[in-house]
């Protein structure tokens, strides 16, 4: 195995930059209209431009004998689970988690089973009695999410989602208590080779107009939650033991419920309340775009490796460690 490939979006530059640092050949599989952009980066050895997602899968499968595909949010959301099931090339991480990540209710059940504090959910619109956020399935980067104060506002919002064809059925969404606090997205890497959980970074998502509404008169604009960027963050050190415990609990639950378990990067998307408690409202079971902040390494990854270590490079370091110990089967599915 000598080649690392990924889909041209999300965190692909970081992934391939890290792979080249670890001595692998790199392949970018991207929509044709992005080929010119990616061609300027010397660490990308080969670029394959596709016309549609079916062709993307064909390109991926060209490397079934010597390559590893690194998944990210665009693979989960846009290539789709049905096409992913046709991929014969090795995938780094647990591909069985994709189905869980695309279903909000299943995602939350994993968090609850891990003993992690989560927001209250409302199965029935009629039970809504506080500020809530309504979320759509999949890795859509916040598209279509909305806040509601009353059950009538929830119903109106659901009707808009159906009419705009963002959802097919009201049961597709999750209605969740809107937790007030500081958002912090805790990034982790679980290494089956080293049997170690690493805290690799923290970010805050920068969302379209919701971050500007505080400067506008009330009711002048409706908030939207489409993620357009990320802001770096560090947490008080006294919070980190709890963050680590949450991460390990989640790793243990995934190992039990979604074999072969957690492999590589994941993120617990959280709110830290004023009493110091941490409420986790979502997880991502693969590399998140917030790690792009730390291509030169994060304040936390330096503590583990004492060298520049992005999550993209950390993935390829894990592959290298597995190659050296003849344990590739432990990290690929």
Curated annotation (Swiss-Prot):
UniProt catalytic activity: 5-amino-1-(5-phospho-beta-D-ribosyl)imidazole-4-carboxamide + formate + ATP = 5-formamido-1-(5-phospho-D-ribosyl)imidazole-4-carboxamide + ADP + phosphate
Presence of the UniProt keyword Nucleotidyltransferase in the record: no
InterPro entries reported for this sequence: ATP-grasp, ATP_grasp_subdomain_1, IMP_biosynth_PurP, IMP_biosynth_PurP_C, IMP_biosynth_PurP_N, PreATP-grasp_dom_sf
Keyword Cytoplasm appears in the UniProt entry: no
GO biological process: 'de novo' IMP biosynthetic process
Cofactor annotation: Mg(2+); Mn(2+)
Function: Catalyzes the ATP- and formate-dependent formylation of 5-aminoimidazole-4-carboxamide-1-beta-d-ribofuranosyl 5'-monophosphate (AICAR) to 5-formaminoimidazole-4-carboxamide-1-beta-d-ribofuranosyl 5'-monophosphate (FAICAR) in the absence of folates.
Annotated HAMAP family: IMP_biosynth_PurP
NCBIfam families: PRK13278.1-1
Protein name: 5-formaminoimidazole-4-carboxamide-1-(beta)-D-ribofuranosyl 5'-monophosphate synthetase
Organism of origin: Sulfolobus acidocaldarius (strain ATCC 33909 / DSM 639 / JCM 8929 / NBRC 15157 / NCIMB 11770)
Chain's gene name: purP
């Amino acid at each position: 195995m000598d080649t690392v490939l990924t889909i041209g979006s999300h965190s692909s530059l970081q992934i391939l930059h890290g792979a080249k640092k670890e001595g692998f050949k790199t392949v970018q599989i991207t929509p044709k209209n992005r080929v010119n952009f990616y061609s300027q980066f010397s660490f990308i050895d080969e670029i394959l431009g596709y016309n549609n997602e079916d062709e993307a899968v064909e390109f991926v499968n060209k490397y079934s004998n010597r390559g590893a595909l690194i998944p990210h949010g665009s693979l989960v959301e846009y290539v789709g689970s049905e096409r992913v099931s046709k991929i014969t090339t090795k995938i780094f991480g647990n591909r069985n988690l994709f189905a869980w990540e695309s279903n909000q209710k299943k995602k939350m059940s994993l968090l609850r089973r891990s003993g992690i504090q989560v927001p209250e959910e409302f199965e029935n619109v009629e039970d809504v009695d506080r500020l809530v956020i309504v979320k759509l399935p999949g890795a859509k980067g916040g598209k279509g999410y909305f806040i509601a104060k009353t059950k009538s506002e929830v119903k109106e919002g659901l009707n808009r989602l159906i009419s705009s064809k963002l959802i097919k059925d009201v049961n597709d969404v999750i209605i969740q208590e809107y937790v007030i606090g500081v958002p912090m997205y805790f990034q982790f890497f679980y290494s089956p080779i080293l049997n170690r959980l690493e805290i690799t970074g923290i970010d805050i998502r920068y969302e379209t107009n919701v971050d500007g509404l505080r400067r506008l008169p009330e009711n002048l604009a409706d908030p939207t939650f489409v993620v357009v960027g990320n802001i770096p963050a560090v947490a008080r050190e006294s919070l980190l033991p709890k963050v680590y415990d949450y991460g390990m609990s989640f790793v243990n639950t995934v190992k039990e419920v979604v074999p072969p378990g957690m492999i590589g990067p994941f993120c617990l998307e959280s709110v830290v309340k004023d009493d110091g408690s941490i409420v986790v409202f979502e997880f991502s079971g693969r590399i998140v775009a917030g790690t792009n902040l730390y291509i030169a390494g994060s304040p936390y990854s330096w503590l583990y490796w004492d060298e520049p270590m992005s999550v993209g490079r950390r993935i390829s370091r894990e592959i290298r460690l597995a190659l050296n110990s003849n344990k590739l089967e432990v990290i690929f599915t």
